[in-house]
Amino acid sequence: MSETLHLSAETRDRAGKGASRALRREGRTPAVIYGGNEEPVAIHLEEKALVKALGTGHFFNSVVELTVGGQTVRTLPKDVAFHPVTDRPEHADFLRVSKDSVVHVNVPVIFANEEKSPGLKKGGVLNIVRHELELVCAPDAIPDDIVIDVAGYEVGDSIHISAVKLPAGVKSAITDRDFTIATIVAPSSLKSEEGDTTKTDAEG
């Protein structure tokens, strides 16, 4: 599970593009806290602190505790808008969450034991169909990643979501089909040889 991140913020008295530009000139990033059956709260936070949090690599899969006016608000980052040229964060959205909340998150997939896959040892290629899985879980149960063991897989095999053991309390958001995450495909050289053999047989 990703560590909880902590950021300090202040409420915004004024909204609008002009006020937002003024905040950015001061090194602050405009943001909003919404959800949880409460009114949205316009805030701003230090740009450097936000950039540092983004640099952790698990920002969007972490609970972020925002300290605003002496109160701590548990949130999940939902979106960050970046400047198209400078790549500076221009705005951030935070969703209020509680321990009873259920959230949708995209979690990266990591493939393990590739050296134990007969198909890969023969020169097969791991064709990754999904680099992330859309999961449903409580905010405090968001995994850092999902590890998929490819030991034993042969060329032509497919890895479906049904073969993946998810952590306790974590479910796939897609439930209407047993979707493919990756396949072990034959190397192009092998395909070429098979094609040549077929062509020769046809000519003969």
From Swiss-Prot:
Part of the 50S ribosomal subunit; part of the 5S rRNA/L5/L18/L25 subcomplex. Contacts the 5S rRNA. Binds to the 5S rRNA independently of L5 and L18. Keywords: Ribonucleoprotein, Ribosomal protein, RNA-binding, rRNA-binding. Gene3D superfamilies: Ribosomal protein L25, beta domain (2.170.120.20), Ribosomal Protein L25, Chain P (2.40.240.10). Belongs to the bacterial ribosomal protein bL25 family. CTC subfamily. Residues 1-23 are annotated as: Disordered. One of its GO terms (cellular component) is cytosolic large ribosomal subunit. One of its GO terms (biological process) is translation. The keyword RNA-binding applies. CDD domains: Ribosomal_L25_TL5_CTC (cd00495). This is one of the proteins that binds to the 5S RNA in the ribosome where it forms part of the central protuberance. The lineage of its organism: Bacteria, Pseudomonadati, Pseudomonadota, Alphaproteobacteria, Sphingomonadales. GO terms for molecular function: 5S rRNA binding; structural constituent of ribosome. Pfam families: Ribosomal_L25p, Ribosomal_TL5_C. This is Large ribosomal subunit protein bL25. InterPro entries: Rbsml_bL25/Gln-tRNA_synth_N, Ribosomal_bL25/Gln-tRNA_synth, Ribosomal_bL25_b-dom, Ribosomal_bL25_C, Ribosomal_bL25_long, Ribosomal_L25_dom, Ribosomal_uL5_bac-type.
